[in-house]
């Protein structure tokens, strides 16, 4: 059963103005890369690019209990997959345009551009991603502080 596809279909039904194609194929890429024990929290579709008029790079973005996954199946062969863990996450920017919106996810390595999203979906996406990343990043930082304190105490 493809849980990713079902969640993306729900998103597409809720926000039909979002431009997205080949949802089943794109969902299969992300489904393939889910780790055992990973639970899907939120999923949506967008175009993985910065341009409004580039309509043929639909990707599926999935927020799990461990990370953010971005995947899309290429038309001829191959696919693209990216994983953003909370420790790699820096910031998220939202742009609300006249017809569509855009989200930029800033990581340590790169900026991920997700465009052609229904403007009404932007707040929901931002809330889900930001809330998860902040919560998990706090856990990660607390774990790092504890480990450094333990190491300092061991050195004494």
Where do the protein language model's features map onto the residues?
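Acidic, Ser/Thr- and proline-rich intrinsically disordered linker/docking segments
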Residues: 1-23, 27-32, 53-54, 74-156
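Secretory/extracellular carbohydrate-interaction modules
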Residues: 33, 37
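Flexible glycine-/small-residue-rich
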Residues: 46, 65, 72, 107
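Polybasic phosphoinositide-binding surfaces of eukaryotic membrane-targeting domains
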Residues: 56-70
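The phosphoinositide-binding surface of pleckstrin homology
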Residues: 38-53, 73
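Small-side-chain structural scaffolding
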Residues: 43-46, 62-64, 101
